[in-house]
From Swiss-Prot:
It is an enzyme of class 2 (transferase). Belongs to the P-Pant transferase superfamily. AcpS family. Its cofactor is Mg(2+). One of its GO terms (biological process) is fatty acid biosynthetic process. The lineage of its organism: Bacteria, Pseudomonadati, Pseudomonadota, Gammaproteobacteria, Enterobacterales. This is Holo-[acyl-carrier-protein] synthase. One of its GO terms (molecular function) is holo-[acyl-carrier-protein] synthase activity. It is found in: Cytoplasm. It comes from the Bacteria. Pfam families: ACPS. Mg(2+) binds at residues 9, 58. HAMAP family: AcpS (MF_00101). Keywords: Cytoplasm, Fatty acid biosynthesis, Fatty acid metabolism, Lipid biosynthesis, Lipid metabolism, Magnesium, Metal-binding, Transferase.
Amino acid sequence: MAILGLGTDIVEIARIESVIARSGERLARRVLSDNEWEIWKTHHQPVRFLAKRFAVKEAAAKAFGTGIRNGLAFNQFEVFNDELGKPRLRLWGEALKLAEKLGVVNMHVTLADERHYACATVIIES
């Protein structure tokens, strides 16, 4: 296996909170997949949940070297946890097509958050 890309992102949680206060659920609808949306609606810390997902998706877009453009959207990157609680990444739509085109066979996600920040790193391998 070879590393195809590495991306890291850090999000200020208060900034996400401010956007939600101004625009309601619009940011969450734009960023979250349908599965994540269902979790977010009843999550005990929805702002923190959204900030962490946003960080992973930005890191993933950086790892793919594309950013969010040319048909890619945040909600095409879905963060979920495996049976041990480890964060994983599932792709949909154009993100999945891009991964197939690049020959991605594995994606690694690490995620951390503290009082003020959430950060994520994504590594993609061929």
